[in-house]
């Protein structure tokens, strides 16, 4: 359970850091996501940008149990459209 929470925290922080860096370009944004995730002791981090959203997926090793995976998205709020 602790590994899952650590993975989610790393994904959340990495995606927010990447979104803040997105104006500098895709490479800079994903480099920042990887840097933040590694600082939080994540074994694997994947970053992708979809429109203006940064999506980060991380994996944290769990002793004797495999891997805990978490994904987070950071970007502009999605405003529901209403017919009108």
From Swiss-Prot:
GO terms for biological process: symbiont-mediated suppression of host apoptosis. One of its GO terms (cellular component) is host cell cytoplasm. Induction: Component of the Rv3654c-Rv3660c operon that is highly up-regulated during M.tuberculosis infection of macrophages. InterPro entries: Rv3654c-like. Residues 1-39 form the signal peptide. It is found in: Secreted; Host cytoplasm. Keywords: Host cytoplasm, Secreted, Signal, Virulence. Interacts with human polypyrimidine tract binding protein-associated splicing factor (PSF). NCBIfam families: tadE_like_DECH. Effector protein that participates in the suppression of macrophage apoptosis by blocking the extrinsic pathway. Recognizes the host polypyrimidine tract binding protein-associated splicing factor (PSF), which probably leads to its cleavage, diminishing the level of caspase-8 in macrophages. This is Apoptosis inhibitor Rv3654c.
């Amino acid at each position: 359970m602790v590994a899952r929470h650590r993975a989610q925290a790393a994904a959340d922080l990495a995606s927010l850091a990447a979104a803040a860096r997105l104006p500098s370009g895709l490479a800079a944004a994903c480099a920042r996501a990887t840097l933040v995730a590694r600082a939080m002791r994540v074994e694997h981090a994947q970053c992708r940008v979809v429109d203006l959203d940064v999506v980060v997926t991380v994996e944290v090793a769990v002793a004797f149990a495999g891997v805990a995976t978490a994904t987070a998205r950071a970007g502009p709020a999605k405003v529901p459209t209403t017919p009108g």
